[in-house]
Amino acid sequence: MKVAVLDLGSLFAKIFKLSTASPAVSSHPGGAAATGSVDSGASTSLREAETLTLLPSLPPDTAASREPFTPVHTPLPASHPRSSAAAQRVEATGCSGSLPSSSGASIAPPLTPYSGSAGSVASVTLPSPGVDWATLPSVTIPLGSNSVTASSPRNPRQLRAPGEREPSVWMAPGPVPKTLFFTLPDIGEEWTSDSDSQDDPEGRGLSEGLRKQSSEKSKDPLPTNFTRNVQKAIDKFASESPSSFSSSGSRTPTEAHNSWPGSSTQSSTTGLSTERSSVSSWRDDEFDKVSAQKVHQLFWEVEELLFEGKVSPQTQNLLAECSEWARRSLHLRVVGRQLVPPTDEGFQHFQGSLPSSATHEALPHVPDHTSSSRELCISGSQIVPEVHSASALTDPDGTESADLTSCSSLKEEVYHVDGNIEEYFAFDRKQDGDEHLGQSPALRGRKRHRHGLPPISPDDCIRDAVAAEVFDHVWTNVVEILEDLIRKTWESALTGGKKHKEKLKVAENRSPHVLMSRLSTDVCSVPPSRSSDTLQPSLAPHFNPPQFPQLHRFSSNFYSDLSGVMTIQAKPLQQRPTYSADRTQNDQDDKLPGGGVGASSRHRLGRILDARGPQTSVKKTPVHRRLPSIASDPQRLKTPTVYSDEILRGTKLQTGIDYLPSPAAVQTSRSRLPPIGSETGEPNTAASGSRPVSYRGRHPQSRVFSAMPDSIERSPLRERTIVLEQLSRPSTTHTFRSDTPRKGSLTPVEFVAHTWTGQSILTGSQYLPKSYQRATLTARKRFQVAS
């Protein structure tokens, strides 16, 4: 099919060359001759023409008659066996020389001619014997044509020139066989994709603007399956927009030649769109622009008249009016009072006193600045409107006027009272030397009674700046003068400091033991600490003797070296024989089996219960407020944990009536827990009965006593039963519960003890409730739990 189209194209090219060689071709004998005329414009218009067909356009010097255009349609016989396929192919490609679709097809309407001066149709002859002649129209459209009748697919109605006829079928005279008259369909998007001709690469597609100027057919005689794709493309690009019509409903004449892809294509949005540059919005915008330009030009001319003195024809009338006002009102002034406070930034209104007189009186010039006040100065004369005389006339409209003859003194008259305008400036002036000394006391008093003016003025700011500059200059001179004296003072202070330092070194070398003994006695009165801050109160009297207070101050500020400032030396260990003996006794008590544990625990319990009364006086001793030694920290840290090489052993506590009948019952009501002291045995001292209670500081009881709440021992039978029921639960917080009676009977010493052993209670409580889950109260059962 493509080969057939190419052959037709080459054949038409050859025929076109023959037709251009001879303007008139004679008819073949026995055949019908058809001649056509080319309505061409001037040679310049033909040069600008662009053909819409595959055939090359006519040259400018083509000889053609200047007759009016007549559409010529000569029938073509259906002699080709594959005419149907050829016709469909040529329709898709848009070739003007397409063959008829079938031999028995119906008659189609003719090609709609183009109206205009530049539209031309080239009539080409087919010198083939035995067949009819056909005309191949070649429509030429000049670029940049201003014709308002150019058709577009958006225009449903063609705008025809006056005197132009409707297109009709034109039949050649003579006998003709049964033929098909057809028109070329509108070209869609498929034209470029289906045409693969390499002979005319520039004609593969039409621009969007030229497609819109193609002819519009009244009917579509072809089947819908042939024109479906083309019609979709036409409907897509030729859809109408409501903004393209004017208010009257008819198309505006400027829409045809002003339509361009950006304005004629319908967007996906609905309704009116101002961004499509419709005629109405464009018109309104243009009117606004013109009005704005006129107003801007008027203001510009007024500014030139006022500031530059340039007179333009537009401001000539304004200048004449201003001159008339100046000629008639030589002494026109605006007087009145300030009623509306100013809102401009930097301006403030200060209410003055009411005018006491109604005459035009110029106040004497009095300087505003006095020696005792700092305020702004208001310079000028006061103008007070004069009270009208009895001869003043009153107009019907309420405006007052006076006769010129009655005002022979040329006093100021008030023509009209309208508005509230007043403007004055406050400024700061220089202080005159002795100008205010010769003034009368009345004028001085008048200035002192003026209130409401701001106290700070630019003159005061200048004075402060000058005073600051003078002070800086004087201070610089003072420092230069005192520089030598300050240097000598520093040298003497440094020399005295060095001498004092040497004396201290000699004193330390001579009696180091005496100094350390004094330090140890002072340190014992305060709690020891690992930091060196606690030694500062005791070291200060030794390194800062009262006889050298000033020298030490100078030496600490101006020392250039740090030798002797920080001294590192060995600290003597503090001996605590009482505490070590108590700790040894505790370790021995914890390691005693059976009766030894019960005896020591009973003795410790009795001692704590007896110490409730005098515990206040015991804590007043400074020795009892000392912190525990560092050596006992490892044993205290090991207290919450159970040793891995030991076995936790315990006995069931006695409850009920047989609980605590004698001191021996305390021994059976306690279970064995890991000891606090070291694992190695230490000799037991005989002074355990006389050791004080408060040496335990924060842990007065052993773990055996701290693991059991002592409320069981002191509470009645009813309370003890409740506590036992609570201990039967697998809870780890029963010791610190708020609903137990222990909280009310807890003493400060016992609270400190349980604070230190609280973790051991929580750790060992998971094993303790197992001994209380038995129903028998008198049975004793030993259990072993491995850590």
From Swiss-Prot:
The signal sequence is none
Q: Which Pfam families match?
A: DUF3719 (PF12516)
The residue ranges flagged as biased composition, category Acidic residues, are: 189-200
**Comp. bias regions, Low complexity:** 51-65, 96-105, 239-250, 262-274
Which superkingdom heads the taxonomic lineage of this protein's source? Eukaryota
Family annotation (InterPro entries):
DUF3719 (IPR022194), FAM149 (IPR039630)
Basic and acidic residues bias (residue ranges):
201-220
Mark out the compositionally biased spans (Polar residues). Answer: 37-46, 144-155, 251-261
What residue spans carry the region label Disordered?
22-105, 144-175, 189-226, 238-284, 432-455, 573-602, 665-697
Coiled coil start-end:
none
State the family named in the UniProt similarity comment for this chain. Answer: Belongs to the FAM149 family.
Record-given protein name: Protein FAM149A
Record organism: Mus musculus (Mouse)
Name the gene that codes for it: Fam149a
